[in-house]
Amino acid sequence: MLYIEKERKLPVNDKYDIIVVGSGPSGMGAALSAGMMGAKVLLIESQGSVGGISTSGLMSHFTGHVRSNLYQEVLRRAALHNTFKRGLKTVTIDPEMLRITYYECLKLANVDLRLYTMVCDTIVENNKVKGVICESKSGREAFFAKVVIDCSGDGDVAYKAGAEYYMGREEDGKMQPATLMFKVGGVDYERAIFPPSFETAVQVPEGEIQALGKENLPFPAGHVLLYGSTLPGIVTVNMTNVIGIDGTNADDLTGYGHCSGVDIIGIEDEVHE
């Protein structure tokens, strides 16, 4: 069954040099860089806070070799705790402090921010994205820009503009399991074990820790991956796996949240043991 939505005129909220869609680490980098260079920038975020996975996702740390001046400035302002692992400088994340720091940086860069605002369509002229159409509590409205940068995480802007895409691996279209990070309090750091990767074999009195995980954790969880945090006694856990999830399907995402919550209970009990 199809329903034909009636045609209507939309208010044009504003025109910008650059619109960035999505306020995760990539979106923050794009918006802050453009703003600091003097561009008129709008950052659009569908959730109620900036930072994406790095904040709302309760991520444990930044990894890799990114060492830009902007990155270093964000870290300096957040006053994050620095550690060293496997020869690489790894920065532990305090999600709340990072969130506050992002807001401060956006203000300093004169970036306009719209939270709770979802991009539901694109404005395309002559095969070029000229703006976006958004839905929010303010209603449906249009924003125009010279450049639109897609940092949505799922390529939402590119998809809505008609770009070609594929999902999952080539042979069967399956995607990696969905993961929900969580934190556990009251941990004795002197006794806790922190395997640095999924593959790291660590011997404990009961046996090899990854083998124990595969044997005892609720399927499809099976690896043991724990990280220290910036707060005493708090450990970040990266061990939930929910398979068969399409990240572009609202029903799948709804079910994933419930399944991850059930997994967390079993994982916490097993890790405690």
Locate each region found by the language model.
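Conserved N-terminal/central alpha/beta ligand/cofactor-binding core
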Residues: E5-E7, K15, S33-K40, E45-K128, ...
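Beta1/beta-strand and adjacent pyrophosphate-binding region of the FAD-binding site
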Residues: L10-G24
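Core beta-strand elements of the Rossmann-like FAD/NAD(P) dinucleotide-binding domain
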Residues: D14-Y16, S138-V147
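N-terminal Rossmann-fold NAD(P) dinucleotide-binding loop
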Residues: G27
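Conserved beta-strand-loop-beta-strand element in the redox core of flavoprotein oxidoreductases
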Residues: I123-A142
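Glycine-rich, N-terminal phosphate-binding loop of Rossmann-like dinucleotide-binding domains
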Residues: S136, S152, A161
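Rossmann-like dinucleotide-binding core of oxidoreductases
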Residues: Y159-E273
